[in-house]
Regions:
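Two-component histidine phosphotransfer core
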Residues: 1-115, 119-127, 135
Length: 136
C-alpha cells in the first residue's frame, strides 16, 4: 500500500440512492486528491464520502477530509475555474477533468462547491438535480 496507516475512510449512501448512476471516477478523483494533497505527516487523516438525498430530485455527493485543506491560492484558483472556466497552475488536472465531466453530463443541473472546513480539511459538495426518470 502506498500510504500505510496514513488515512482511514468511511462511505455512507442512503439505500434509495444506490440505484442512481454516478459517472465513473468522479468520486475517486476527489478522494484521490484528498489522499495525495491532504495527508498530514504523523496524523491519521479521515476521509468521508457521503451520498444523500436532499429533495425528491436532488442528491448531494460530499467528499470531505480532516487533512491540510486547500491553500488560499488553490481555493482562489478553484473559484476562478468554477465561475469563469479559467485554469491556473494552482489547479489540479483531476479537479478540472471531474468538474468538466460533471458539467458535460449534467449541464446546469449540477452544482459544485469546493471549500475548507472551519478547523481543518477540505470539502467537495456535488449537488445533482436529476431528471424525473433518474430520481430516487
Amino acid at each position: 500500500m502506498r500510504y500505510p496507516n496514513a488515512f482511514d475512510y468511511k462511505v455512507t449512501c442512503e439505500e434509495a440512492i444506490k440505484i442512481v448512476p454516478i459517472p465513473p471516477f468522479i468520486i475517486e478523483s476527489f478522494v484521490g486528491n484528498a489522499i495525495k494533497h491532504g495527508l498530514k505527516p504523523g496524523k491519521m487523516t479521515e476521509i468521508q464520502v457521503n451520498v444523500s438525498k436532499l429533495e425528491e430530485f436532488r442528491i448531494l455527493i460530499q467528499v470531505k477530509d480532516n487533512g491540510t485543506g486547500f491553500s488560499d491560492d488553490s481555493l482562489d484558483a478553484v473559484e476562478e475555474f468554477l465561475e469563469k472556466g479559467i485554469v491556473s497552475e494552482e489547479l489540479g488536472v483531476g479537479i478540472c477533468n471531474s468538474v468538466a465531466r460533471l458539467r458535460l453530463i449534467y449541464g446546469d443541473k449540477c452544482e459544485i462547491r469546493i471549500y475548507n472546513q472551519e478547523l481543518s480539511g477540505a470539502v467537495v459538495d456535488i449537488t445533482l438535480n436529476l431528471q424525473k426518470t433518474e430520481a430516487v
